[in-house]
């Protein structure tokens, strides 16, 4: 499957070392103003090669809108976007053409499809996430019309974690650190891993502010279920928490429940979701990334002929994928919320009658 969503649908295409990466958005309402400057700004947040803490592969990541927009506004038809690949180095992968890289999708892709793209992993490369960010940027424009904003930051690198949530600082931080006092430590850990030809894991928190009540479907398309599915579909993500998440297992009901008052909920252990439906509180999710599997240390593995071999990778890779992962998580949350907002329409007969002029 290469698509996400029920009514607001994102379909992505392209490979890491192909002509480019792109997406098609279907279901975007007509009349939405498309801010191309914002679109490219979001892509620049994900763009590689901007610091010592990400892959040195340099891409301009300027998006070309192919269809679905006229005179700056969506037309209601499929919105197609394309991002050319400009800095591929496929020769870096020639020596491992038949070798399964440990921790990568090479082994599973090969046995599922009978072939695979050895050049940077093809569709399994994080390069594909540029298309998700492009689609998510349009979703953010739509959500802005509804008063919803989404933001994120890194709260953990390796064993070092922080409870501080300074999202304004994260937007200025080269490693997207939520805690100003932890920024240098995060940098040191990433530099240490890179210097040892290794990588390191990390975690981000993403929030949505201005949430309405009622987004999400009961049982089989819950908001938290949809968010978990979208976020777990992101490269290197190994766990997703909503609200208290794993910590809720250590609490009593009296500690975990959020008291409800006239002005709203007193706390937000639920992370903004009850019964799979948004409750109007801020949406809170945490996303945990494994260490980037592309490392330059010798590793034991197999080749396609079944021989045991030693693999030492070349190429250009992120030492900590969580650093650039935040903007992609924001995009996925935006896509899910945009879809849920459209699905929310028609939940009540009165709403349908009013839309068609029968409720008067």
UniProtKB/Swiss-Prot annotation:
Task: Identify the residues that bind FMN.
Answer: 123-125, 235-236, 275, 290-294, 316
**Binding-site list for NADP(+):** 46
Lyase found in the keyword field = yes
Return the Pfam families for the record: Chorismate_synt (PF01264)
Q: Which PANTHER family match?
A: CHORISMATE SYNTHASE
- What does the entry list under GO cellular component? cytosol
- GO MF entries: chorismate synthase activity; FMN binding
> What pathway does this protein act in?
Metabolic intermediate biosynthesis; chorismate biosynthesis; chorismate from D-erythrose 4-phosphate and phosphoenolpyruvate: step 7/7
Task: Provide the cofactor list for this protein.
Answer: FMNH2
Q: What is this protein called?
A: Chorismate synthase
| Classification lineage | Bacteria, Pseudomonadati, Campylobacterota, Epsilonproteobacteria, Campylobacterales
Q: Return the InterPro entries for the record.
A: Chorismate_synth (IPR000453), Chorismate_synth_AroC_sf (IPR035904), Chorismate_synthase_CS (IPR020541)
């Amino acid at each position: 499957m290469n698509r996400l969503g029920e009514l607001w649908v994102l379909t992505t295409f392209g490979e890491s070392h192909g002509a480019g990466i792109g997406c098609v958005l279907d279901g975007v309402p007509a009349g939405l103003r498309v801010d191309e400057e914002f679109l490219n700004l979001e892509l620049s947040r994900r763009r590689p090669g901007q610091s010592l803490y990400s892959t040195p592969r340099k891409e301009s990541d300027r998006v070309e809108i192919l269809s679905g927009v006229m005179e700056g506004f969506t037309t209601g038809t499929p919105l197609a976007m394309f991002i050319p690949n400009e800095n591929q180095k496929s020769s870096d992968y020639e020596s491992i053409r038949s070798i399964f890289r440990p921790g990568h999708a090479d082994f599973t892709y090969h046995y599922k499809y009978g072939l695979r793209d050895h050049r940077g992993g093809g569709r399994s490369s994080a390069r594909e996430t540029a298309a998700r960010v492009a689609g998510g940027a349009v979703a953010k424009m739509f959500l802005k019309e509804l008063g919803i904003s989404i933001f994120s930051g890194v709260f953990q690198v390796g064993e070092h974690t922080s409870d501080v949530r300074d999202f304004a600082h994260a937007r200025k931080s080269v490693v997207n650190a939520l805690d100003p006092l932890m920024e240098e430590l995060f940098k040191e850990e990433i530099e240490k891993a890179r210097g040892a030809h290794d990588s390191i894991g990390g975690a981000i928190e993403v929030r949505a502010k201005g949430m309405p009540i009622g987004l999400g479907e009961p049982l089989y398309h819950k908001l938290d279920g949809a968010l978990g599915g979208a976020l777990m579909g992101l490269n290197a993500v190994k766990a997703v928490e909503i609200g208290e998440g794993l910590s809720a297992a250590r609490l009593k009901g009296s500690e975990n429940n959020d008291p409800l008052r006239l002005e709203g909920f007193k706390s937000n252990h639920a992370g903004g979701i009850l019964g799979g439906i948004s409750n109007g509180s801020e949406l809170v999710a945490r996303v945990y990334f494994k260490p980037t599997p592309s490392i330059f240390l010798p590793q034991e593995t197999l080749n396609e002929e079944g021989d045991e071999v030693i693999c030492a990778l070349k190429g250009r890779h992120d030492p900590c994928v969580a650093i650039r992962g935040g903007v992609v998580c924001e995009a996925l949350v935006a896509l899910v919320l945009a879809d849920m907002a459209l699905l929310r329409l028609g939940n009540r007969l009165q709403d349908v009658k009013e839309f068609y002029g029968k409720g008067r």
